[in-house]
Amino acid sequence: MSEELSFSAMVKAELALLTPELPCCRRMELAGLVRALGRLELSGRGRFALTLSTDSAPVSRKVIRLLKSVSPVRYEVMVMRRRKLRKNLVYRVHIPHQPGVAELLQLAGFIDEAGRPADWVEPPELANDHCRRAFLRGTFLGSGWVAGPEKQHHLEITTTATEAADALGQMLFRGGIAARMVARRESLVLYIKEADQIIRFLGLVGAHQALLRYEEVRVIKEMKNQVNRQVNAEVANMTKQADAAARQVEAIKRLEAAGALERVSPPLRELAGLRLAYPDASLKELGELCRPPVSKSGAAHRMRQLMALAESLE
């Protein structure tokens, strides 16, 4: 299992253990799960059945726990193995047609009050902040994914209906999160690529352990990046200094060969001799070796005079 999948699974395992205290929040979390995982089956006028499928055992247990708490409907649990990916199991919770199924579908916005299928009908409970958090948690458990912070910052939630995607975007926005949307095959994906926004989302849905882990990795990563930037800057400065020193040595040797050093002032002759004696030293260090010592700017001024004199010989 990759780092990204294991982190996403860790987040979902943590969220799957949470049980909202308020009945309205339990209803909205179940609504989010039904919305994300549910497949509506219509077998005649007003006869609905519902199947929820997931490859996460903790999520399937969360579905069952919320069903028991929210609705008295009968359900069947099936565990199947994918044909193409034999290692993966699929957990299916099938709710056959019965009294209460329509209420679940209406709760998730799949049908309107008249029982007609709809792309999205917003439950009135979503006017409450705590219920929106619960709905987002259920939706993420069903169709969300988050990358591990070690490599990249990416969190996404997948949905199918444009109206539902817009509603999710508004819920996230009201929670302080600006998600972007992209079409992917037959789905719409809301995604976040900023670390601060992902951390905010994890806190919003209640994944506090995952949030701390994400923050810890991010801080370590930023510290490493800062150290790397400092090292790169120092290496660049050292390279620049070495190149400049090499040019200075070459210029002074030309002056020496032409006998021009004998005609310069003693301070310039002193600095030229120090540069030849200490080719790796910085101008600041050369200035400190002068007698009397001079500042870095003073040493640089003298060196510019020597370089200009060498250029005049060409």
From Swiss-Prot:
Keywords: Cell cycle, Cell division, DNA-binding. It holds the Pfam family HTH_WhiA. The keyword Cell division applies. GO terms for biological process: cell division; regulation of sporulation. InterPro entries: Homing_endonucl, Intein_endonuc_central, Sporu_reg_WhiA_N_dom, Sporulation_regulator_WhiA, Sporulation_regulator_WhiA_C, WhiA_LAGLIDADG_dom. Residues 282-314 bind DNA. One of its GO terms (molecular function) is DNA binding. Belongs to the WhiA family. Involved in cell division and chromosome segregation. HAMAP family: HTH_type_WhiA. This is Probable cell division protein WhiA.
